Amino acid sequence: MEIDSEKIHERKQSDYNSLDERFEIQKEMYRGQQYSQIYFARLHLMRTLLYSLAPTWKSHLPVCKVLGLEKGKECIIVGTLFKHMKLKPCVLDEYSKERSVTPLVKPHNFMHPDDNLILEDESGRVKLAGSALSPAIYVTGVVVALHGKETNAGEFFVEDVLEAGLPPQIERPIDLQEDKYVVLLSGLCIGSKSANPLQFQLLVDHITGHLGDEEEQGLAAQIVHVVIAGNSFEFPRKLINGQNLASKDQSTLYEPIKELDIMLSQIAAGVSVDIMPGTNDPANFALPQQPLNRCLFPGSSPYNTFRSCTNPHSFDVDNIRFLGTSGQNIDDLGKYSEAKSKLDFVERTLRWRHLAPTAPNTLGCYPFTDRDPFLIETCPHVYFVGNQDKYDNRLIKGSEGQLVRLICIPKFCETGIAVAVNLRNLECHTLSFSTQINQS
């Protein structure tokens, strides 16, 4: 009698190291401080960097402060950009037009042909002119060095621009001989009408090795880590009104959390998983968002493989550095600047060395007093952004040989797509679990 013996696949192991400490708000105390201090900290750190790059960029030119500009004299100035936007919403306008018959227009993008840029340092500010610096590309909060001269009109005519560029990168390990994968997904939106429980369950079954034939299970065994990049929940807005809820409404609110916890406990039983907060999740609104409370996940939190993380989130897997957000930083850039694709926005933040340049101007963030945690000091190998409309990826190379895989993760509830990143070569591909359910 023949006995069929099924091959047992052992999941590959990896070393994990969280780097979220700089995004955690622990010792900070809010004493009514304003946001000027985070801008000052950003300018101080970035100016030191740009000063060090200036001699190799324009060694023959002096570096001046805005207050020290002389008409017609070429020089370099370093400062923070401010973008004057005609269509940018204003709180005062909202109050003044509250009773007006004219509706407040809320366009998807607030760009206007008359927008202009201003450079500011601690000594003063100057309006910028010339075509070398496009208002369509830059936003308020970016620190740059500019080569140019002051005109008779009192403007600074820009002839060239120096950005910080990609930061130094830790060396990729050369001893990775086998394929190992990190799976990235976002926008589960459990509780929404667009959420499909079958899609997520198929993904969970694939990750845990309960789906497919022997070859499929062998591929699943190569998954060593899972990251859920925000917007895991969607609650009924009518119930979130600050009022006491009836027991039935409380149960309705808790249902999406309970459903996600069941799914996460299945994943955590077989592989390590990180969950990041997003715009719609029960976490603080301002960046950096703090980890979702572990009491929300009574089934998952007992596993040491389950981690509730910050947004932004940074970590190493087998010395491959990952950095990512749940998408708020890129979505905000899309409102106040233009690009051919979301990946262009992602690449710009990396070359500006700042995760969220529009914070705190148009993107909420904590008023740090002595540091700016969004500065990118070390170049990641993988830089991902969650909750985008579609999947996209790009491999970029820095001037010092840095290689970075940029990834836009689509909303899983709308696309049924997750992204698998190979640690060995930084190649990535999609895992598609799109299904059709008849609502008739």
From Swiss-Prot:
Domain of life of the native organism: Eukaryota
Catalytic reaction equation(s): DNA(n) + a 2'-deoxyribonucleoside 5'-triphosphate = DNA(n+1) + diphosphate
Enzyme Commission number: 2.7.7.7
GO cellular component: delta DNA polymerase complex
Main location: nucleus
GO molecular function, one term: DNA binding
Enzyme class: transferase
Keyword Nucleus attributed: yes
Pfam families in UniProt: DNA_pol_D_N, DNA_pol_E_B
Keywords tagged on the record: DNA replication, DNA-directed DNA polymerase, Nucleotidyltransferase, Nucleus, Transferase
Intracellular or extracellular location(s): Nucleus
Similarity comment: family membership: Belongs to the DNA polymerase delta/II small subunit family.
Record note on quaternary structure: Heterodimer with subunits of 125 kDa and 50 kDa.
Known role: The function of the small subunit is not yet clear.
Protein name: DNA polymerase delta small subunit
Natural source organism: Arabidopsis thaliana (Mouse-ear cress)
Taxonomic lineage from the root: Eukaryota, Viridiplantae, Streptophyta, Embryophyta, Tracheophyta
Gene (UniProt): POLD2
